[in-house]
């Protein structure tokens, strides 16, 4: 599934509910899911980590839909297929 396909799926399924909730409350739900992801990671719950990542992505798509942001387009603009620092692919920058 492409990023736009996922964002459209979330729009089709939840846009009406998201609009009623509004961007501010939807953003709070997103943060709640980030917290759940953090807890699952810290506890070493590998299965839950993947599920929580999916939840985080879904809530991010909901926020993007409410704010009329095309995630796939923004990702391509922000992250071209090479490192922004060394211009190589894969990155050959010195370690962190």
What is each stretch, according to the model?
Residues 1-53, 57-96:
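Flexible "arm" and connector segments at domain edges
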């Amino acid at each position: 599934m492409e990023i736009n396909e996922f964002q459209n799926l979330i729009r089709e399924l939840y846009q009406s509910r998201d609009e009623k909730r509004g961007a501010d409350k939807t953003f709070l739900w997103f943060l709640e899911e980030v917290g759940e992801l953090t807890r699952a990671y810290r506890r070493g719950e590998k299965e839950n980590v993947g599920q929580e990542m999916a939840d985080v992505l879904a809530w991010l798509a909901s926020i993007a839909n409410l704010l009329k942001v095309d995630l796939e387009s923004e990702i391509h603009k922000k992250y071209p297929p090479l490192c922004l620092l060394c211009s190589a692919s894969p990155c050959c920058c010195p370690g962190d």
